[in-house]
């Protein structure tokens, strides 16, 4: 038998049954699941210093275990000296086993290392069961060597679920162990 991440096994063995009984689904296929996790990092100073973008890509790749891609500006913004199509950030889309491994690492290892951590905001859902939050420093991940980073920067994490509303999405993430503050 091949390797199955701990959170994926937990989802199949426990979470589905709990969600079906809690929300009175007729089938286990109606139970919401995590579709993908998108981790992104905006590097506004990449306009002046291309090395910052390369370091952001390598840091995201180290954190997630998957190669990051550059993101481009959708439109020009004169105030920030950004032209359309210019590289201004990086992102990684995680699916499958890598997604479950990252979620486990985020919930159990990285978030507890945040200074004065009291949980993530429970109201940051988008109305469709998807959850987004920001992390102020990338150094909370153990893969990042503090001495080798060029600058401390934050990153955004979006967890896309198949939940129909925020209540189902919050219940799903709570059962995975997401530490909500409210």
Swiss-Prot record:
InterPro entries: Ribosomal_uL5 (IPR002132), Ribosomal_uL5_bac-type (IPR020930), Ribosomal_uL5_C (IPR031309), Ribosomal_uL5_CS (IPR020929), Ribosomal_uL5_dom_sf (IPR022803), Ribosomal_uL5_N (IPR031310). One of its GO terms (biological process) is translation. GO terms for cellular component: ribonucleoprotein complex; ribosome. It comes from the Bacteria. GO terms for molecular function: rRNA binding; structural constituent of ribosome; tRNA binding. Keywords: Ribonucleoprotein, Ribosomal protein, RNA-binding, rRNA-binding, tRNA-binding. Part of the 50S ribosomal subunit; part of the 5S rRNA/L5/L18/L25 subcomplex. Contacts the 5S rRNA and the P site tRNA. Forms a bridge to the 30S subunit in the 70S ribosome. PANTHER family: 60S RIBOSOMAL PROTEIN L11-RELATED (PTHR11994). Belongs to the universal ribosomal protein uL5 family. This is one of the proteins that bind and probably mediate the attachment of the 5S RNA into the large ribosomal subunit, where it forms part of the central protuberance. In the 70S ribosome it contacts protein S13 of the 30S subunit (bridge B1b), connecting the 2 subunits; this bridge is implicated in subunit movement. Contacts the P site tRNA; the 5S rRNA and some of its associated proteins might help stabilize positioning of ribosome-bound tRNAs. This is Large ribosomal subunit protein uL5. The gene is rplE.
């Amino acid at each position: 038998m091949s390797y199955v991440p701990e959170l994926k096994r937990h989802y199949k063995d426990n979470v589905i049954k709990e969600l079906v009984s809690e929300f009175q689904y007729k089938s286990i296929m109606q139970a919401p699941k995590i579709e993908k996790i998108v981790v992104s990092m905006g590097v506004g100073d990449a306009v002046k210093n291309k090395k910052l973008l390369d370091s952001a890509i390598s840091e995201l790749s180290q954190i997630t275990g998957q190669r990051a891609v550059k993101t481009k500006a959708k439109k020009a913004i004169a105030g920030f000296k950004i032209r359309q199509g210019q590289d201004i950030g990086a992102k990684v889309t995680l699916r499958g086993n890598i997604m479950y491994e990252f979620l486990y690492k985020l919930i159990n290892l990285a978030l507890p290392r945040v200074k004065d951590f009291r949980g993530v905001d429970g109201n940051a859902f988008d109305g469709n069961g998807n959850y987004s939050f920001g992390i102020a420093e990338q150094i909370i991940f153990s893969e990042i060597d503090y001495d080798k980073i060029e600058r401390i920067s934050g990153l955004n994490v979006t967890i896309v679920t198949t939940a129909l509303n925020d209540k189902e999405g919050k219940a799903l993430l709570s059962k995975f162990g997401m530490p909500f503050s409210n």
